[in-house]
Amino acid sequence: MANITAQMVKELREKTGAGMMDCKKALVETEGDMEKAIDYLREKGIAKAAKKSDRVASEGMTHVISNEKHAVVLEVNAETDFVAKNDNFQQLVDALAKQILAVRPDSLEDALKTEMPNGQSVQDYITEAITKIGENISLRRFEVKEKADNSAFGEYIHMNGRIGVLTLLEGTTDTTVAKDVAMHIAAINPKYISRDDVSSEEVAHEKEVLTQQALNEGKPANIVEKMVEGRLKKYLSEISLEDQPFVKNPDITVGEYVKQSGGKVVSFVRFEVGEGIEKKEDNFVEEVMSQVKK
């Protein structure tokens, strides 16, 4: 039998929103396999589909800037929210964004080696900022996009940089539409542009989970297939940007809204500070230990 720790229960609870004891049971039944435990809870109707990268933990900020041809979205991390709101830190983030936009490096490693306008490497520039600010700071990730003439960038920053979104639309130069789409993405967090982008493996996995879920609900086998078909269609529309009801006008989809301007979404990047990075453990572990040991 796998050793089920308090941290594992905590992680599963955060990913699924299920109760503590349900999470413990799911982990026991699946011998500690996190992904199988998520499926177990979903099949039992206890949890909804979990996003793989919904564990937001570290501090920092995202930033988005652009020029006529290129745009960059990046994330810079710090240790505390206090520093993330500091003017010096925000100036650092802006300087790094401008550097990456100007140089357009291929990788994070290349970016850290590039030379800032003052002659320092980006790495040395960050190291100097660490000394001044007094916290560990790191350039975590970035993406650079290029656009053609008949295209538009959409930039949106939410909650003072907690979430940063960059969209690229082709077939239109309407930056208002592009920004509206970026705002929608910040709020709804779609996984794909179109349902056609969803892999056959993911579709097959979801169909398997939904089938087991319907059978566990006691539905007759002869209607399970039709139920699964409807639920799968709903799932695909929920994770696909073009099919989602537009946040500013739910009567139309995002795809329909963009089409009104003659455009089409060709790419988007959504960074949320700390996605997938775990913080130090807090008192929650103590809270669940007594439950796990029962």
Curated annotation (Swiss-Prot):
Which InterPro entries is this protein grouped with?
A: EF-Ts_dimer_sf, Transl_elong_EFTs/EF1B, Transl_elong_EFTs/EF1B_dimer, Transl_elong_Ts_CS, UBA-like_sf
State the UniProt keywords alphabetically.
Cytoplasm, Elongation factor, Protein biosynthesis
Kindly list the places in or outside the cell where this protein is found, as annotated in its UniProt entry: Cytoplasm
**By its UniProt entry, which CDD domains does this protein fall under?**
UBA_EF-Ts
Q: Where do the segments described as Involved in Mg(2+) ion dislocation from EF-Tu lie?
A: 80-83
Q: Which SUPFAM superfamilies match?
A: Elongation factor Ts (EF-Ts), dimerisation domain (SSF54713), UBA-like (SSF46934)
Q: A Gene Ontology CC term for this entry?
A: cytoplasm
Where would you say this protein principally sits, based on its record?
A: cytoplasm
What superkingdom does the record give?
Bacteria
Any one Gene Ontology MF annotation carried by this entry is: translation elongation factor activity
Cited Pfam families? EF_TS
Q: Which HAMAP family match?
A: EF_Ts
**Which family does the record claim for this protein?**
Belongs to the EF-Ts family.
Q: Read off the PANTHER family from this record.
A: ELONGATION FACTOR TS, ELONGATION FACTOR TS, MITOCHONDRIAL
Relate the protein's function as given in its record. Associates with the EF-Tu.GDP complex and induces the exchange of GDP to GTP. It remains bound to the aminoacyl-tRNA.EF-Tu.GTP complex up to the GTP hydrolysis stage on the ribosome.
What protein is this chain from? Elongation factor Ts
User: From which source organism is this entry?
Assistant: Listeria welshimeri serovar 6b (strain ATCC 35897 / DSM 20650 / CCUG 15529 / CIP 8149 / NCTC 11857 / SLCC 5334 / V8)
